[in-house]
Amino acid sequence: MMRAETVLVIPFADGIGDFINAQPLIAALKRRFPEADFTVAASEHGNLLVNDPTVAVLKPSGFNYEPGRMAIALRPLLPQRLMAWFAGPTFDRELGPFDMVINLFYAWEKGMDFRTYWTPQVPPVPGAVHSLDFLADEIEKQLDITITHEQRKPRLIVRPSASLYASRFWLDNDLEEQKVVALVPSTNMAIKRWTLDAWLKLDAHLREMGHRTLLFCDRQSSSVQRAFEAAGSTAIPVYTSLDNVAAVMSRCDLAVGVDTGLLHMAGALDVPWVGLFGPTNPEVTGPYDQGKGISLVAPFEKQTTCGGCWKHFKYEDDSCRTLQDSSCMSHLAEAEVLAACVDVLKRERTTPPLYLPTYGYPEPVGAY
């Protein structure tokens, strides 16, 4: 039987949602190598999201690198698969050495059919496979193990200190006995954003229905927060460390968000959700358990110029080649999103958040 005392796991990407989705895979690997010490190559957010405090999260120095103009210009010429392969020996040398390196980044780039399935088509193209399923299947084949469907579902554990923060937040803002909706408009990719006007309308309609809204912000006094305030919204801004964000999110009755890390967080906390998609396919990169929410894909029939969208914004830049001043997200109607919110809010939440006693967690640093 294959043995290893030290294992490095390289997630398939370095976003918040990517780390959340990698956790069930890491758990499966730990079951296969129960005596091994595990390290994950990820940015600081990993320390605030990792469920297992025995797993070390280390940030490679390359993650601090901001590419210059020349690097950005050359990037389309460098095969992403090659860059993913080099991550293995590079991170092993910097962070290790390790007995075993499990490079999910390379497996993902090598095997996923991004050209066909990354950007959702209208009508949908059958045959899409979720990234988590693809990687779990690869691990099963390589290590001769079984990862059941239930074991593949991402779970996020709320830490005790964060739970206390959320309890105080609820009391301070008089949210007890209220229906609370989390709004997640922020993403670092402009092409995935829904229009600000649509967000303001959705917020107003939800509040008119008697719900309280929380505006999850990626920075203090963000432009979105200022726009909400200028519109007279009473949405409560949320900006805190990621473990606290998870605790606040876990108490919400619904999360509405674009394809970003906090949407995956909601799914991993069993918070009912409505996901807004345009250039990315919910069947490939959306929350894993689709039974917990509704994925809405912008009803924009893709043009020939959309054929390379997966490559343009995933590897090159952040612009739509088809719509000059926006993206297909602008075709997603607020009325459709509101109707989905009403539908999901009618459902009873079936699973409470997971909590663990305090032990061995790093101090909270950084924020969403």
Where are these regions (language model features)?
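Catalytic machinery of carbohydrate-active enzymes
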Residues: 1-368
